[in-house]
């Protein structure tokens, strides 16, 4: 296929439509305008963000395609932001000034408005089974923001599990790929305050224009919108505007979207349009890895057996682990003592005592019995029907995961069962969690309930 100067961009688009996803084509390529001469083609992007993205991801592909269509290896393709001029009166100096102004405006707005924590990146996010999927999806979004399959991205889980870290990591990842992008991180409470302030100062037009034109909007703790009708109404329209334009939306909450009370159904429905991913409390291996990673960042000597001890005792969330580590570090520096298990046991005695009270076997039995609508006595009975056996195995596995009780102690609390029965239950549940999505979902729900 060959082209003429007058049909070049149209012919390029026809081929590009088959080479890129429909979402990418609509978002990045269709908005471009062309100005073609015998020696080059200038593409005009409606804003700096699209210009930067096309320049980084498609310009080489477009240039090669244009050269092939014209059979001219010297043909050049350039891109700049702005509207295609009706007459070519803009000088090079004027165009350079326009580009610099646009870049400076976006950079200034980004530095002032993004609120991203540059220290929260993917490289220092400790991965484990509890957050593996969430991290993978977040990285995909950072590389390809706006892809419909993950828009919005909804991360949910208990306090201190790393949702906010991942949120910032995605934002920083988007900016790393495209420094011109307008990425805004906002806690839900701050968003509400911004909305009320705009309302009172009669600046709603400015408020709407800003939030509806960003390239990625990251809202933390969306459950804070509960019962705030005005905020929900405005966010509904912001969501629609961004989604229709293929802009990325990322939200976090302490619970699954449909479980958030006093949030309008139309918003809950939209929260589920993309992908919702749970972040669970970290398992022992991840807890230990987090402690060792944080200790390394502090240049702190933390023996692995001590990390195992702390990780085995404190199971609720990452924030709790960091708090414990900070206390141990401070006490060690103040006293000059070596960090041993005995030293940690003494330093964290109040935290460890509280943790023992937080999750008990009795509490686990009650939560599991309520969840499956059976009696606690069923969990302790000799009954072997499937509707009793599976909850019993789950309860025993949870007791091993969330308490400091030994296998024999757990067995005694479940109708004087042998420790080998408890071990078998733990192995069976671990296997089922990998093979059966229903069991994994039950496990996640129970863990979240017990971690509150």
Curated annotation (Swiss-Prot):
Gene giving rise to this polypeptide: dnaA
Any GO MF annotation of the entry: DNA replication origin binding
Region (Domain IV, binds dsDNA): 333-452
Residues that, per the record, bind ATP: 160, 162-164
Family: Belongs to the DnaA family.
The organism's place on the tree of life at top rank: Bacteria
UniProt xrefs under SMART domains: AAA, Bac_DnaA_C
Protein name, UniProt field: Chromosomal replication initiator protein DnaA
Gene Ontology CC: cytoplasm; plasma membrane
Record-level GO BP terms: DNA replication initiation; regulation of DNA replication
